[in-house]
C-alpha cells in the first residue's frame, strides 16, 4: 500500500472537508449532546421514581429495615443483637392500641421505641424529643388532629387503652410529634419504656395471635442489601 508523504496537503483536504460539512457536523454534535442530556435526565428521573416507590412501600409496611422478628422475649432479642452477621439491630416493645372513639378511623399503636427503631419506622419526632418521663409521648399529627390536640410540645391529653384485659385512661404530655402518613397501616404513639415495663412486663414466651403486650419487635439491617 502506497503512503502519501505530504501531510500538509492531507490536513488541508481534511480541513476543507470539515468546512464544507460544517452545518452537518454541527447538527451531529448537537444530536450527540441532546442524546446525552436525554439519557442523563431519563436515568435521573427513573432513579428518583424508583426511590420514591421504595419509600412509599416502606411507609405502607411501617419500616425501612431489611428484616425483623416479631413477638420475641428479651432474652431472644439479646441473642439477635449479638449476631455478628448483622450491621445494626433495634427494637420496640408493644403496649396496646389506643381506643379513643375519635381514633376508630385512625388506628394508633402504642409502644416503646428505641431511637433507631423510631427512625426506621418513620415516627421519630420532627419537633421535640423521644419520651423520657413516664407520662411523656410522641404522636403523629394525624393522631393529634383526630383527638383535637394541637401539635404543640407540652400539650396534655388522655388516651384510652387496654393491657392484658385491664382498661386504662391515662393523661400524657406531648414531648414530640411527627408528620404521619395516611398510606401507613397504623399511626404510632411512642411511649416511655418505664410505662411499658410497669404495665406490660415481658412474658417468658409469646404466641402468634395471642396477647402481644410486652413483646419485642426486633428489626435489623444486614451488612449488605444484596
Describe the role of every protein-language-model region.
Residues 1-37:
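N-terminal Sec/SRP start-transfer signal
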Residues 46-226:
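Basic-flanked hydrophobic alpha-helices used for secretion and membrane insertion
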Residues 35-46:
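Alpha-helical transmembrane segments
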Amino acid at each position: 500500500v502506497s503512503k502519501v508523504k505530504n501531510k500538509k496537503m492531507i490536513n488541508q483536504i481534511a480541513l476543507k472537508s470539515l468546512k464544507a460539512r460544517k452545518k452537518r457536523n454541527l447538527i451531529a454534535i448537537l444530536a450527540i449532546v441532546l442524546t446525552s442530556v436525554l439519557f442523563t435526565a431519563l436515568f435521573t428521573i427513573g432513579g428518583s421514581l424508583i426511590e420514591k416507590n421504595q419509600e412509599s412501600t416502606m411507609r405502607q409496611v411501617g419500616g425501612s429495615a431489611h428484616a425483623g422478628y416479631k413477638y420475641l422475649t428479651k432474652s431472644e432479642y439479646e441473642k439477635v443483637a449479638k449476631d455478628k452477621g448483622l450491621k445494626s439491630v433495634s427494637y420496640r416493645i408493644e403496649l396496646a392500641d389506643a381506643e379513643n372513639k375519635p381514633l376508630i378511623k385512625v388506628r394508633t399503636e402504642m409502644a416503646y421505641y428505641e431511637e433507631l427503631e423510631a427512625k426506621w419506622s418513620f415516627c421519630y419526632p420532627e419537633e421535640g424529643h423521644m419520651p423520657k418521663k413516664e407520662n411523656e409521648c410522641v404522636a403523629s399529627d394525624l393522631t393529634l388532629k383526630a383527638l383535637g390536640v394541637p401539635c404543640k410540645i407540652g400539650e396534655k391529653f388522655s388516651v384510652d387503652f387496654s393491657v392484658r384485659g385491664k382498661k386504662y385512661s391515662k393523661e400524657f404530655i406531648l414531648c414530640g410529634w411527627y408528620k404521619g402518613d395516611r398510606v401507613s397501616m397504623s399511626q404510632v404513639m411512642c411511649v416511655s419504656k418505664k410505662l411499658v415495663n410497669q404495665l406490660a412486663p415481658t412474658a417468658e414466651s409469646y404466641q402468634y395471635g395471642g396477647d402481644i403486650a410486652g413483646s419485642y419487635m426486633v428489626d435489623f439491617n444486614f451488612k449488605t442489601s444484596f
